[in-house]
């Protein structure tokens, strides 16, 4: 049922996995979501509202997932002299 969603997530994770300075993760929140008669979707609760409903077009069932993306290239290199200069000294 969620083959297309799984493929999209796999492609996203595979793309990010090839880069050492990026991290992308997807976690299942332990619940599903469904489309209501009025077109709205049931809420995904838990994890401080990090969970969102992801569903395929035209489907009435979805998965509650939490996604995380971090671009480590925005941070300095750990061997940068500025970091060493800012370190506490004894």
From Swiss-Prot:
GO cellular component: extracellular region
Subcellular location: Secreted
Annotated S-S bridges: 29-51, 33-53, 44-64
Coiled coil: none
Gene Ontology MF terms: C-X-C chemokine binding
Keywords of the record: Disulfide bond, Glycoprotein, Secreted, Signal
Extent of the signal sequence: 1-18
Glycosylation sites: 32
Major site of localization recorded for this protein: secreted
Task performed by this protein: Salivary chemokine-binding protein which binds to host chemokines CXCL1, CXCL2, CXCL3, CXCL5 and CXCL8.
Protein name: Evasin P1128
Organism: Ixodes ricinus
């Amino acid at each position: 049922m969620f083959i297309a969603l799984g493929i999209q997530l796999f492609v996203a994770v595979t793309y990010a996995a090839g880069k050492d300075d990026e991290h992308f993760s997807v976690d299942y929140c332990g619940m599903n979501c469904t489309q209501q008669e009025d077109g709205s979707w049931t809420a995904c609760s838990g994890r401080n509202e990090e969970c969102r409903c992801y569903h395929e077009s035209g489907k009435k069932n979805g998965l509650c997932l939490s996604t995380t993306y971090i671009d480590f290239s925005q941070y300095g290199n750990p061997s940068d002299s500025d970091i060493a200069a800012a370190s506490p000294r004894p």
